[in-house]
Design a protein with these regions (language model features):
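Helix-to-loop transition at the C-terminal end of transmembrane segments
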Residues: 58-65, 208-213
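Active-site recognition of the HExxH zinc-binding catalytic motif
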Residues: 65-85
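Membrane-water interface of transmembrane alpha-helices
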Residues: 82-86, 90, 166-171
Length: 239
């Protein structure tokens, strides 16, 4: 990435980060108000999913958690590269830390087609901020009867907590993906889109049994709220 493109990318990400940080705060306030007014206990069921995962992580997944996290990590590279960047995937590899040979610290990799030495920040940093299994569950939630939503929301909370553990483990300065894109740019990108994705998820599970709000309704609500807030700031500046 040239210095000019890097500067423009960082500048736009900083602007976007300011917006998504404010909107994340608004999203949290929305969730708190919804819980206080007892509109739907979806957030409660997500919380149950968080607790179930923490218990499972400690007592049931201990032997295989590293390869599960590696598969999720490499799966994000593959998903974004194949679906959004239209790359051809040649190889997908994931292994447990127990299988590493002496001097080898590579738990997994994805081999794909790309043009020259071009590095896509989208696919390179996808594992650090894209909870793709959670979004797939939110799409699956569209097909579920209202009476069964609590079960799905527990699983959604379970999957999201899994990603929190993955992000905590993988997001390090010495991580090869982060070093490849640059530490400052990487953290800026990761934080920005992590807040963005979490906001969409929080909106998507609101409503529920009384007034179901699905992933598409959540996305719409997020962008409508964001646009209204931007217009409010513009009006304040003009006046």
């Amino acid at each position: 990435m040239s210095k000019f493109r890097r500067f423009i990318t960082i500048f736009l990400l900083i602007l976007f980060l300011i917006i998504v940080t404010f909107e994340f705060y608004r999203t949290i306030m929305y969730a708190v108000n919804a819980s206080v007014n007892q509109l739907y206990s979806g957030y409660l069921w997500m919380g149950v999913g968080f607790i179930v995962y923490v218990i499972s992580h400690k007592f049931f997944f201990k032997k295989n958690i590293d390869i599960m996290q590696t598969m999720s990590h490499e799966g994000a590279h593959m998903l974004v590269g194949a679906l959004f960047l239209r790359r051809k995937i040649y190889q997908f590899n994931a292994k447990s830390a127990d299988a590493l040979s002496y001097g080898d610290n590579t738990l997994g990799f994805v081999s794909s087609s790309r043009k020259g030495n071009y590095i896509s920040i989208m696919s390179t940093l996808a594992p650090y901020m894209l909870p793709y299994l959670t979004f797939l569950l939110l799409l699956f939630r569209l097909m579920i009867k209202n009476e069964c939503l609590p079960i799905v929301d527990v699983i959604i909370g379970f999957s999201l907590m899994f990603y929190f553990f993955c992000w905590k483990k993988d997001t390090r300065r010495d991580q090869s993906d982060i070093r490849l894109c640059g530490v400052f740019l990487s953290y800026l990108y990761i934080i920005t889109f992590m807040l963005f994705n979490l906001s969409l998820i929080i909106y998507a599970v609101s409503g529920g049994i009384s007034e179901p709000l699905n992933i598409f309704g959540g996305i719409r609500q997020y962008f409508v709220q964001t646009w209204n807030d931007i217009m409010m700031v513009v009006d304040l500046i003009r006046n």
